[in-house]
C-alpha cells in the first residue's frame, strides 16, 4: 500500500494569498504523518499537480491494482473523482471510495418517502433515531501497518516549493478537551469564554475522527452532539442540492431581495471598521488568526446581510478566504440561512403593510457611525 497526497493545483492556484493558513496547516499535518510513516519503514508520496496529472505519473512509476480514497461531497470534488475513476478504469485499475468524514451521508438519513430533509430539526430527530454504537466503532488500523510499501522516506515539498509561505499561526491541538465538551451547552454562547472546542480545522482536514468526537459527545453533552449533526446535515444538503455550492440560493425565490451592496461598507466590514465593537472584534480576530467564535460569526453575518443589506454571498466568499476551518458545506449552509430568514421577514413585512416593500430603501448604513 502506497500512501499519497496531492496538493491540487486546481485549488491552490485560485487562492488569493501565498500566506494561506489552511495550506500551512495541511503542510504541518503531512510532515507529522511522514514522521509516523518513516518509523514503519514507509513514506508518503506527495505531488503538487492536478489530480489527473498526478495519477498519470503514478501509473508510470508503479504497478497499481487498486486505488482507495474517501468520499468528498463538494461539487468540484465529485467532478474530480469522476475524472480519476474514468482514467483508472481505462488503465484497468479499480477505484474504491468510502464514507469517512461524516457519521451519516447521502441517503442514510432521509424522510420516510426517501426524499432528503431540508429542515434541521426533523433531520436531527431521524439522525438520533438511526444512530447506534456500530456507527461509532473505531477501526483497528494498526493491524494493517505492515501492508505499507517499504521505501526510504521522501521529504514533503516545502511550502515555498509549492508557492506558499510560512505563517505565524499557532494551530489548535487535535486532542478534544473533555472539560470544554462537558460545559459546552453552558459556555458556547459567550465569546469571552474559551468555551468552544477549536476542533473545526481538524474535522475539516481529517486530523481527528468524527466518530471519536461523536462517541464522546453522546455521553458528555447533547448540545455538542447537535453541532456535529449540523455538520452532517449541511454535507447532506450539499450532496442533494449541489447548486448551493455554486453561488446559488437554496431556492430561487430567496434571490428576490434587492441588496444595497455598498462596496465601501463591505470593505469596512471586512476590515473590522464598522463602529460596532462586537462586529469589529470578530472581523479583526478572523483577519489576524483565521478563527472567529461561532456566536460572533452569526452576529457579523447577520450585520452584513440584515443591517447593511449586502448580498450574503459576499460574506460567504470572505469567510471562505479567511477561515482556518473553512468547510464549503457548513459555511454555505450557515450563510444561506440568512437569505431564507430575510425572505421570510420581508414577506411578513409585506403582509403587515398591505403593500410591496422595497427593502433596499431601508436606512442601513455605517457611514455615520463612530469609528
Predicted stretch roles:
Residues 78-79, 97, 132, 309-321, ...:
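Short conserved catalytic/interaction loops centered on acidic-Pro-aromatic/His motifs
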Residues 87, 202, 213-217, 227, ...:
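Generic, well-ordered alpha-helical scaffold segments in large soluble proteins
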Residues 1-131, 220, 284, 330:
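Trp/Phe/Arg-rich N-terminal binding region typifying the photolyase-homology
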Amino acid at each position: 500500500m502506497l500512501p499519497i497526497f496531492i496538493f491540487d493545483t486546481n485549488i491552490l492556484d485560485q487562492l488569493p494569498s501565498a500566506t494561506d493558513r489552511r495550506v500551512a496547516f495541511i503542510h504541518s499535518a503531512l510532515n507529522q504523518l511522514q514522521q509516523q510513516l518513516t518509523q514503519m519503514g514507509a513514506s508518503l508520496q506527495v505531488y503538487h499537480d492536478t489530480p489527473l496529472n498526478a495519477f498519470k505519473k503514478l501509473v508510470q512509476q508503479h504497478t497499481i491494482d487498486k486505488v482507495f480514497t474517501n468520499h468528498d461531497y463538494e461539487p468540484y470534488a465529485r467532478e474530480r473523482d469522476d475524472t480519476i475513476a474514468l482514467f483508472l478504469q481505462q488503465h484497468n485499475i479499480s477505484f474504491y471510495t468510502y464514507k469517512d468524514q461524516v457519521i451519516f451521508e447521502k441517503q442514510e438519513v432521509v424522510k420516510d418517502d426517501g426524499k432528503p430533509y431540508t429542515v434541521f430539526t426533523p433531520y436531527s430527530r431521524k439522525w438520533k433515531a438511526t444512530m447506534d454504537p456500530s456507527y461509532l466503532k473505531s477501526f483497528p488500523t494498526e493491524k494493517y501497518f505492515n501492508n505499507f510499501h517499504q521505501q526510504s522516506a521522501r521529504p514533503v515539498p516545502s511550502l515555498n516549493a509549492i508557492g506558499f509561505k510560512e505563517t505565524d499561526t499557532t494551530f489548535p491541538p487535535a486532542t478534544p478537551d473533555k472539560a470544554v465538551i462537558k460545559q459546552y451547552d453552558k459556555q458556547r454562547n459567550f465569546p469571552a469564554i474559551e468555551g468552544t472546542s477549536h476542533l473545526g480545522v481538524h474535522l475539516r482536514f481529517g486530523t481527528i475522527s468524527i466518530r471519536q468526537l461523536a462517541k464522546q459527545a453522546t455521553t458528555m453533552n447533547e448540545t455538542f452532539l447537535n453541532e456535529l449533526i449540523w455538520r452532517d446535515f449541511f454535507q447532506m444538503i450539499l450532496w442533494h442540492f449541489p447548486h448551493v455550492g455554486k453561488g446559488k440560493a437554496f431556492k430561487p425565490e430567496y434571490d428576490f431581495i434587492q441588496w444595497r451592496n455598498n462596496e465601501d461598507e463591505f470593505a469596512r466590514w471586512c476590515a473590522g471598521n464598522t463602529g460596532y465593537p462586537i462586529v469589529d472584534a470578530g472581523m479583526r480576530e478572523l483577519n489576524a488568526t483565521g478563527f472567529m467564535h461561532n456566536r460572533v460569526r452569526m452576529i457579523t453575518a447577520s450585520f452584513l446581510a440584515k443591517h447593511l443589506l449586502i448580498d450574503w454571498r459576499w460574506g460567504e466568499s470572505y469567510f471562505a478566504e479567511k477561515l482556518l476551518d473553512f468547510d464549503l458545506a457548513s459555511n454555505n449552509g450557515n450563510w444561506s440561512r440568512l437569505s431564507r430568514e430575510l425572505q421570510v421577514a420581508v414577506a411578513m413585512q409585506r403582509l403587515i403593510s398591505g403593500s410591496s416593500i422595497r427593502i433596499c430603501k431601508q436606512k442601513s448604513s455605517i457611514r455615520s457611525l463612530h469609528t
